[in-house]
Regions:
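Extracellular-loop-to-transmembrane junctions of the mid-late helices
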Residues: 1-13, 114-153
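Hydrophobic alpha-helical transmembrane segments of multi-pass membrane proteins
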Residues: 9-25, 29, 34-60, 77-82, ...
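C-terminal transmembrane-bundle signature of multipass membrane proteins
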Residues: 147-151, 174-248
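Alpha-helical transmembrane segments in multipass membrane proteins, preferentially the mid-helix core
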Residues: 18-23, 83-91, 141-167
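Alpha-helical transmembrane segments of polytopic membrane proteins
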Residues: 5-13, 68-81, 131-143, 206-220
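Membrane-interface helix-boundary motifs at transmembrane edges
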Residues: 24-39, 63, 90-101, 161-170, ...
């Protein structure tokens, strides 16, 4: 069972690392802000943030000092990634909204304040579940679920245009997959933090929470991969399906 649980974590780590690096490399070539924001968001929350926090929990007990350092790096990385996703949601979906810009700014300030508080007090979310830990995780879940809703809303609009032959079916599907992936990551994180608050133990010490996180991570990994690294067969399927709908 333990080996099965780690499949989802490994898939999420590999997919988010590959996609994140690719998006940042794409930004380096074309200097488009959305690619940078989503790339940093994926890398920060995924392989760096999630990876370090998971490894920090594994080290806890035998190597407490190293555990806190590694977990702390994960906290800062995940918070930076979450802020990048808040800015992405504002830039891509509501670029002219002052209210959304203010929301992204407040979220970024909140994430930074929580990180600095936990760093200055030496607390962490491994065992120390304080207000800053709850707020930081809530903000992280918020950026994921908000991004999921926005992506799925955008997908619905573009799907109508695709049926008229006015939108790229591959790009349209990318929004759908991104919505599914972000939603899975957000729900998985929400379940984990809720269980930790109620039970008072790290998620990795609660078997059913570990399984839930692994399965949500697996869904997020598959969706992320098909969103940004679709296979030729899958791309061909999307194009052929769109062509049939246009002809009908």
């Amino acid at each position: 069972m333990q080996s099965f649980m780690w499949i989802g974590f490994a898939a999420f780590f590999i997919a988010s690392l590959t996609v994140g690096v690719r998006l940042v490399a794409l930004w380096w070539r074309n200097r488009q802000l959305p690619e940078l924001l989503i790339g940093l968001g994926v890398l920060g929350i995924g392989p760096v943030g999630f990876g370090c926090m998971t490894f920090g929990q594994i080290l806890h007990g035998d190597y407490d000092t190293a555990s806190r350092v590694v977990f702390g790096v994960g906290i800062f990385a995940a918070s930076g990634g979450a802020f990048a996703k808040y800015v992405f949601n504002h830039t891509v979906y509501h670029p002219d909204s002052r209210a959304v810009r203010a929301l992204a700014t407040v979220a970024g300030a909140g994430l930074l304040a929580c990180c600095l508080w936990e760093f200055s007090t030496g607390s962490s979310g491994i065992r120390d579940i304080g207000a800053s830990y709850f707020i930081r995780t809530f903000l992280q879940v918020g950026c994921l679920l908000w991004g999921s809703i926005e992506a799925l809303r955008y997908w619905r609009m573009m799907r109508r245009r695709t049926r008229l032959g006015l939108a790229d079916p591959v790009v349209t599907n990318r929004f759908f997959m991104w919505g599914v992936g972000a939603g899975a990551a957000g729900v998985g994180t929400a379940i984990g933090i809720t269980a930790q608050l109620l039970i008072g133990r790290p998620p990795l010490e609660i078997p059913w929470v570990t399984l839930s996180s692994s399965m949500h991570g697996l869904v997020a990994a598959v969706a992320l991969w098909f969103a940004f690294l679709p296979t030729e067969a899958y791309t061909r399927f999307l194009l052929e399906r769109a062509a049939r709908h246009v002809q009908a």
